[in-house]
């Protein structure tokens, strides 16, 4: 082997070897235990960022470790290739989304290869390819036939800039998450998939996901939002109209003082016909902040409709208001207001001088003070007629029963979850496979006409989707009749909801999935991705798997057994304020800093001499110009160093602070490993290790070796604390570097240790490990080598440190044989100077002995 560690040479050679040998290509093998490790597929934006590198390094470490355990490991990669950014980039660069996307895929694929990830590239897929999305279209038609797909006109969040629909989660502070334009409300026809039909199963099966983060499961439980309550019908006075509301607190029903409906409610529209002020208010509401998260903090506004409803149990007149905090998409689009016992209702009633009626006693049995806020705690009913004196539970049941008896209420289970709107009014997505015949009949595209191919040779004007602008594209013939194709495309979450299954059979052309391959590999054993996907992708991912199961394509209930959500990558952020008052962010690579004795930045300047303000560590982003290009780091230090730093600098699920000094430290460590291996191999072959001939020092070193193997195995396999695994290897390396190399057994032990170290490092630093394994004479290639096994016998201590106490106070520590008896330990303690002086002239009245740990002498 060469004396110097030169990653730029060895990494390209090793990568070429993997390519030529197709080292990571796998097929189904019933004779081997399978392991499917998957990182969330990237969007081909053009360049990898450090967040990608962290995600994929974690997945690769796990995959390589499991491979060394002898498993048949599938680790695929592909491209989530549809999506809005491609359209913007195409307009900006005067091209079409397809060539821009394919060029990015080629570039990023090369970047992934430079990082040495062990992917089965034969399974690579891009979701924008017709051979992929044809099966998504086919599946959609099957869901339609099963009654799980429908079309309805619905109020949506509309981004006027991007001209597309946004999910509620994509509306941040009333603005589009992508372009920051103010979001509007708009009624348009949309296709929906009935995820609500699976709400109970999606909720209950979270309990099966024992190896998913609790935080993700809690977020999904809250998003599904199951509640038990009563749906109640009010009659609008002087009309035949009925108004339905849902409440989880029927025990407070006698405290209703007003009803509130959404701006989009039919009753609101009816009331506005002869009320211009109300019509204006409704228009204002339609363009107000619309994300559900905004509801809690935005100003509550309302206007009386002039309509009244009759309280179903008392007959009292209850005014009907339009309120901006009621959403048409949630529940019935109307709510009953109990301002005495709901804070939002209290704030609204206080603002508009509406009655506030208490109907629940305070905990001490007194009437609650509602002058400053509502009393939201549950308690005993009062001011509620025949229901006075009932507890919360009894009141709930009694009022629900009374409403049911009168035919104006029924118990219901409600969900916060809404059906999945999958229509997007953009071009760069999979066409929705539905057609409309001349007579108005809507039907799925026949199977023999699939895929409905998205034309790729288009001109983008940045405003209208090319397939909407091209009237000819929509024209087709179905069953001999002229028909028009749907010109909306699928939400890109459709593609990313089933890609994991298609990886098991990416070239299968007889169906969506090859059942034999899918059921061999699925479910995914380890999924890796960011927690920001908890309530969108990860919920759709689980939903789609259940749809696949119920179509007979897979035989498991959940798509992934274990989930690891990696933390964000942070970097220093610097800026100076320009003459226009705006912040100009400067890349950390263009900044010179001065630090104090504690390493804190005290001064920063850029290459132009501008004095900079240090904004602290923040997520790497284009907006703060603090992204670090992985390719630059790989060229400077090598892929193994970047990978090692990524896994060492922080626990996988925590944020990682990018520090180039830490990268340099990882590089120095690899050089030390290389140097020790070089010095060892230069001395020639070693003899076999003779365990019986080892002296105490050699036994101690071997004990440390096998304890390290045990710890690293547990840290990677069970605990997934990769940083502590690397720390343990580093600690062992320090001991090996100091170990004597005078005798043949010294060198034989070093040979065993280095072969183990190289294998333990292999998941993290596969290129260097590949070369070092060969240089050390390891059998075969390291990619097929078994993980080192910790020998129990080697880890047994010859001697132990025992704490000696006199009357419960520590007086000394002694080293004794591991199998020493109480008498032997006591005799050895009596010889210890620090202990002996406390035993002079006293009587030992009691001895407390914990073998291998403690001797406590009680004297008097």
UniProtKB/Swiss-Prot annotation:
Motif 'KMSKS' region positions after renumbering to this chain: 619-623
Localization (cell): Cytoplasm
Motif annotated as 'HIGH' region, chain positions: 42-52
Transmembrane segments: none
Its EC number(s): 6.1.1.4
GO molecular function: aminoacyl-tRNA deacylase activity; ATP binding; leucine-tRNA ligase activity
Binding site for ATP: 622
Keywords assigned by UniProt, alphabetized: Aminoacyl-tRNA synthetase, ATP-binding, Cytoplasm, Ligase, Nucleotide-binding, Protein biosynthesis
InterPro entries reported for this sequence: aa-tRNA-synth_I_CS, aa-tRNA-synth_Ia, Leu-tRNA-ligase, Leu_tRNA-synth_edit, M/V/L/I-tRNA-synth_anticd-bd, Methionyl/Leucyl_tRNA_Synth, Rossmann-like_a/b/a_fold, tRNAsynth_Ia_anticodon-bd
Main location: cytoplasm
Reaction equations catalysed: tRNA(Leu) + L-leucine + ATP = L-leucyl-tRNA(Leu) + AMP + diphosphate
Enzyme class name: ligase
GO BP terms: leucyl-tRNA aminoacylation
GO cellular component: cytosol
Pfam families reported in the protein's UniProt record: Anticodon_1, tRNA-synt_1, tRNA-synt_1_2, tRNA-synt_1g
HAMAP family (UniProt xref): Leu_tRNA_synth_B (MF_00049_B)
Family classification: Belongs to the class-I aminoacyl-tRNA synthetase family.
Protein's recorded name: Leucine--tRNA ligase
Highest classification ranks of the organism: Bacteria, Pseudomonadati, Pseudomonadota, Gammaproteobacteria, Enterobacterales
């Amino acid at each position: 082997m060469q004396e110097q560690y030169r990653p730029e040479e060895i990494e390209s050679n090793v990568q070429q070897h993997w390519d030529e040998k197709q080292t990571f290509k796998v097929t189904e093998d019933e004779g081997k235990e399978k392991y499917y490790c998957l990182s969330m597929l990237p969007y081909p934006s053009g360049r990898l960022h450090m967040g990608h590198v962290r995600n994929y390094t974690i997945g690769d470490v796990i995959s390589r470790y499991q491979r060394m355990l002898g498993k048949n490991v599938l680790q695929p990669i592909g491209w989530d290739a549809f999506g809005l950014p491609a359209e913007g980039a195409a307009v900006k660069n005067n091209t079409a989304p397809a060539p821009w996307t394919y060029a990015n895929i080629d570039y990023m694929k090369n970047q992934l290869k430079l990082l040495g990830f062990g992917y089965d590239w034969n399974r690579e897929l891009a979701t924008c390819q017709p051979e992929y999305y044809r099966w998504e279209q086919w599946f959609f038609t099957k869901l339609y036939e099963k009654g799980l797909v429908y079309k309805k006109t619905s109020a949506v969040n509309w981004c006027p800039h991007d001209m597309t629909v946004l999910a509620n989660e994509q509306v941040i502070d009333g603005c589009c998450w992508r372009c920051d334009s103010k979001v509007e409300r708009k009624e348009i026809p949309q296709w929906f998939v009935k995820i609500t039909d699976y709400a109970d199963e999606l909720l209950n099966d979270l309990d099966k996901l024992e190896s998913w983060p609790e935080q993700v499961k809690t977020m999904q439980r809250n998003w599904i939002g199951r509640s038990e309550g009563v749906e109640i019908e009010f009659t609008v006075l002087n009309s035949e109209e009925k108004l339905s509301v849902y409440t989880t607190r029927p025990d407070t029903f006698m405290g209703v003082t007003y009803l509130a409906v959404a701006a989009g409610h039919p009753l609101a529209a009816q009331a506005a016909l002869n009320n211009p002020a109300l019509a204006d208010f409704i228009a204002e509401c339609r363009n107000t902040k619309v994300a559900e998260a905004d509801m809690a903090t935005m100003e509550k506004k309302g206007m009386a409709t002039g309509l009244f409803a009759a309280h179903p149990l008392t007959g009292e007149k209850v005014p009907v208001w339009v309120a901006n905090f009621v959403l048409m998409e949630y529940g019935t689009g109307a709510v009953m207001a109990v301002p005495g016992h709901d804070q939002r209702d209290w704030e609204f009633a206080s603002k508009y001088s509406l009655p506030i009626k208490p109907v629940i006693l305070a905990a001490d049995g007194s009437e609650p003070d509602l002058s400053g806020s509502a009393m939201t705690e549950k308690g005993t009913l009062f001011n509620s007629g025949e229901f006075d004196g009932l507890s919360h539970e009894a009141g709930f049941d009694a009022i629900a029963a009374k409403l049911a008896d009168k035919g104006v209420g029924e118990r219901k289970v409600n969900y916060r979850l809404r059906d999945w709107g999958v229509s997007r009014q953009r071009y760069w997505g999979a066409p929705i496979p539905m057609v409309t015949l001349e007579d108005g009949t809507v039907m799925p595209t026949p199977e023999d006409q699939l895929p409905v191919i998205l034309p790729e040779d288009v001109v983008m004007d940045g405003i209208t989707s090319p397939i909407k602008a091209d009237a000819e594209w929509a024209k087709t013939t179905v069953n001999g009749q002229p028909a028009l194709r749907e010109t909306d495309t699928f939400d890109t979450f459709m593609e990313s909801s089933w890609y994991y299954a298609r990886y098991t059979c990416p070239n299968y052309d007889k169906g969506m999935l090859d059942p034999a391959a899918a059921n061999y590999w699925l479910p995914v054993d380890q999924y890796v991705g960011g927690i920001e996907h908890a309530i969108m992708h990860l919920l759709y991912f689980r939903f789609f798997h259940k749809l696949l199961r119920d179509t007979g394509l897979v035989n498991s209930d959940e798509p992934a057994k274990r989930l690891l959500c990696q933390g964000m990558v942070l970097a220093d952020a610097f800026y100076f304020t320009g003459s226009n008052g705006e912040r100009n962010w400067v890349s950390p690579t263009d900044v010179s800093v001065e630090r104090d004795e504690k390493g804190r930045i005290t001064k920063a300047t850029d290459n132009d001499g501008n004095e900079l303000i240090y904004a602290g560590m923040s997520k790497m982003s284009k907006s703060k110009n603090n992204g670090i290009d992985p390719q630059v780091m790989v060229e400077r230090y090598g892929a193994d160093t970047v990978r090692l730093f990524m896994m060492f600098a922080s626990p996988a699920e925590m944020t990682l602070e990018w520090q180039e000094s830490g990268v340099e430290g990882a590089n120095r460590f690899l050089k030390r490993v290389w140097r020790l291996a070089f010095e060892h191999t230069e001395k020639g072959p070693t003899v076999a290790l003779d365990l019986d001939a080892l002296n105490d020092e050699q036994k101690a070193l071997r004990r440390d070796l096998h304890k390290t193997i045990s710890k690293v195995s547990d840290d990677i396999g069970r605990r997934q604390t990769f940083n502590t695994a690397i720390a343990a290897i580093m600690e062992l390396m320090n001991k090996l570097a100091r170990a004597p190399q005078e005798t043949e057994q010294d060198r034989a032990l070093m040979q065993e240790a280095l072969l183990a170290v190289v294998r333990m490092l292999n998941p993290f630093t596969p290129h260097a490990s590949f070369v070092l394994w060969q240089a050390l004479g390891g059998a075969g290639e390291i990619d097929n080598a078994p993980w080192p096994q910790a020998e129990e016998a080697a880890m047994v201590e010859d001697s132990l440190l025992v704490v000696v106490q006199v009357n419960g106070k520590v007086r000394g520590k002694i080293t004794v044989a591991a199998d020493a008896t109480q008498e032997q330990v006591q005799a050895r303690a009596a010889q210890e100077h620090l202990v002996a002086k406390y035993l002079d002239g006293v009587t030992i009245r009691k001895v407390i002995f914990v073998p291998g740990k403690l001797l406590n002498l009680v004297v008097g």
